[in-house]
A protein has these predicted regions:
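Phosphate-binding beta-alpha-beta segment of Rossmann-like dinucleotide-binding domains, i.e.
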Residues: 86, 94-148
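Short beta->alpha connector loops at strand-helix junctions that form conserved
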Residues: 31, 71-72, 88-99, 194
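N-terminal glycine-/charge-rich "phosphate-binding" loop or analogous flexible N-terminal tail
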Residues: 1-44, 173
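N-terminal Rossmann-fold NAD(P) dinucleotide-binding loop
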Residues: 158-159
Length: 220
């Protein structure tokens, strides 16, 4: 069996031991990206990828390919419908980065409400030490308690964001096509999209990219 690993540095910054794959056959790794992905896949049985885009036309040039593994949560880099038509299974890692991404969403919120990077730069520039009253105030911090966060997509990542937001004393309005009653409490409830948009102080998008969710938030 031949295994091709595209986007090697992005998939493995160092902690994954690829040598275990050697037990299953020939393993070929590529570190750079090219437009002609089909030439890299070639006669491989299995391909692992992260950012490389694979179209149906690419897959048609790889008749030996039997399995595609997307080492990420999102799999829009692969023409899944085309792969299905050709009988090639496509797998992803649905729980990858769940905690980290929810944490990052809250980190961005704290940056917006406190301008941490700006004030850090000003302190390092010496502004605090040179101020006559040892204090400067360019942006008023926004307290999160009793503010409302709208979460569009209360799945794995949305639930992490919701949990942390509630820990800050925020109320959560959630919009999701699938509603889990176990997630509803005095600080978190489901609602329709228009109500969420009209009543949220901040909105977090945690829904997957499907045709029906593309451009979900627009100028209107």
């Amino acid at each position: 069996m031949k295994i091709v690993i595209l986007d090697h540095p992005r998939e493995n910054p160092g902690e994954i031991d690829w040598s275990r794959f050697d037990e299953y056959g020939e393993v070929v790794r590529y570190s750079d990206r090219v437009e002609d992905v089909a030439s890299r896949i070639g006669d491989a049985d299995v391909v692992f990828l992260n950012k490389s885009k694979v179209t149906k036309a690419d897959l048609e040039k790889c008749p030996n390919l039997k399995f595609i593994s997307v080492i990420a949560t999102g799999y829009n880099t692969v023409d899944v419908d085309g792969a299905r038509e050709l009988g090639i299974p496509v797998a992803n890692v649905p729980s990858y980065g769940t905690e980290a991404i929810g944490q990052h969403a809250i980190a961005l919120l704290l940056e917006i409400t406190n301008h941490i990077a700006y004030h850090d730069a000003e302190v390092r520039r010496g502004r605090k030490n040179n101020d006559t009253d040892w204090c400067f105030w360019d942006y008023s911090p926004i307290e999160l308690e009793n503010k409302t966060m709208g979460i569009i997509g209360l799945g794995r990542i949305g639930q992490i964001t919701s949990r942390v937001a509630q820990a800050f004393g925020m109320k959560v309005l959630a919009y999701d096509s699938f509603q889990n009653p176990a997630l509803v409490n005095e600080n978190c409830r489901y609602t329709d999209l228009d109500t969420l948009l009209a009543n949220s102080d901040v909105i977090a998008l945690h829904c997957p990219l499907f045709p029906e969710t593309e451009n979900l938030i627009n100028k209107a």
